[in-house]
Amino acid sequence: MVEFSHTKKIGSAGRFGARYGRKVRVRVRDVEIKQKKAYKCPVCGFMKLKRISTSIWECKKCGAKMAGGAYTPETGAGKVVAKAIRRVIESKTKEI
């Protein structure tokens, strides 16, 4: 009999079988889906940004490398900071 490394509902976390509990396996599945997904490159704009290793992302089209989050190129905190910086820059340009 052939063993499957994944299942329909749990995806790649099916490799753990019945171990570790359902919630943990679902969480692992969600993280792995996020990290394996192709993201939009901030330099060239193509959907070719892939994870090389922890927090290192590379565009397969233009070759640009960047540091980002461990599982996604931009973290939630990074988005908040970028938005705050954008607001400060916009307010300074309005004053001038």
From Swiss-Prot:
Protein known as: Large ribosomal subunit protein eL43
Cofactor: Zn(2+)
Pfam families: Ribosomal_L37ae
Keywords, in A-Z order: Metal-binding, Ribonucleoprotein, Ribosomal protein, RNA-binding, Zinc, Zinc-finger
GO MF assignments: large ribosomal subunit rRNA binding; structural constituent of ribosome; zinc ion binding
An example Gene Ontology biological process: translation
Gene Ontology cellular-component terms listed: ribonucleoprotein complex; ribosome
Cofactor note as given: Binds 1 zinc ion per subunit.
Family membership: Belongs to the eukaryotic ribosomal protein eL43 family.
Species, as recorded: Methanococcus aeolicus (strain ATCC BAA-1280 / DSM 17508 / OCM 812 / Nankai-3)
ZnF bounds (C4-type): 41-62
Disulfide bonds: none
